Amino acid sequence: MDGIVQNMFTFIVIVEIIIGWIGNGFIALVNCIHWYKRRKISALNQILTALAFSRIYLLLTVFTVIAVSTLYTHVLVTRRVVKLINFHLLFSNHFSMWLAACLGLYYFLKIAHFPNSIFVYLKMRINQVVSGTLLMSLGLLFLNTLLINSYIDTKIDDYREHLLYDFTSNNTASFYRVILVINNCIFTSIPFTLSQSTFLLLIFSLWRHYKKMQQHAQRCRDVLADAHIRVLQTMVTYVLLCAIFFLSLSMQILRSELLKNILYVRFCEIVAAVFPSGHSCVLICRDTNLRGTFLSVLSWLKQRFTSWIPNINCRSSCIF
């Protein structure tokens, strides 16, 4: 019975990864085609494209780890392999989180309005602020990598230069993974906090705008209010998906003794994979250009499919 549930959980994770590949690949492809045709790309599309590539990279890394852990349940892992796996996971997850936070920061500076000299100064330099935020995050990535590598060196020395990579082993499941998750929670909470802050400030900006409209007896919504609402709808889904991702990390920390159970690990992976896969679908639905291109592709596929079926029926009737 456990084998059936494990296979079902693994199948669900793989489906989520495939959906994430398709969604993020579509975003990257559409933006790259527009970039090639127009010979220029906007700052927003730059962030979306970089975010899509980072999540493709993240999902590919997760898929590789799942495939290896499923096919080879007992693998002797050297110090270099452990560091390599963790570097790819940390690197891809770092840029996935920080680029998403930079996207929220870009929306906030572009849409929100505050009569403050500092805010106006930042608003006039959106590209520099976003680029600077991403560059400063590299320091956190370096620190996170340094801490993880120091921990790996210490533990591998304790286990005589090797670790038995077995999810049923207490050495790796309940100890090694927990420290990794704790570090990820600490460093991942920073971009998540930034996203929450920009989300709350957008709500406050919308509230101030509505209050100002009421004072001037303007009852109909204007363009600025509509822009606030559209961005807030996108930010709400992002915050919820990111909260689900943090839930999966918290589950692994609070119930660390269950990490030796492969079913529990797979369930946490299912919850965590919702964020990079689901957010790409949300971005496609909320972005006008991406949504229009996606609907055009669906219409083209529908036409191809409807023209393909009569040809099959004609060939089958000729055979019989």
Swiss-Prot record:
Glycans are attached at residue 170. It is found in: Membrane. It comes from the Eukaryota. Residues 30-55, 110-128, 207-233, 286-320 are cytoplasmic. It holds the Pfam family TAS2R. Residues 1-8, 77-88, 150-185, 255-264 are extracellular. InterPro entries: TAS2R (IPR007960). It is a multi-pass membrane protein. GO terms for cellular component: membrane. Keywords: G-protein coupled receptor, Glycoprotein, Membrane, Receptor, Sensory transduction, Taste, Transducer, Transmembrane, Transmembrane helix. The chain crosses the membrane at residues 9-29, 56-76, 89-109, 129-149, 186-206, 234-254, 265-285. Its main location: membrane. Putative taste receptor which may play a role in the perception of bitterness. Belongs to the G-protein coupled receptor T2R family. This is Taste receptor type 2 member 129. The gene is Tas2r129.
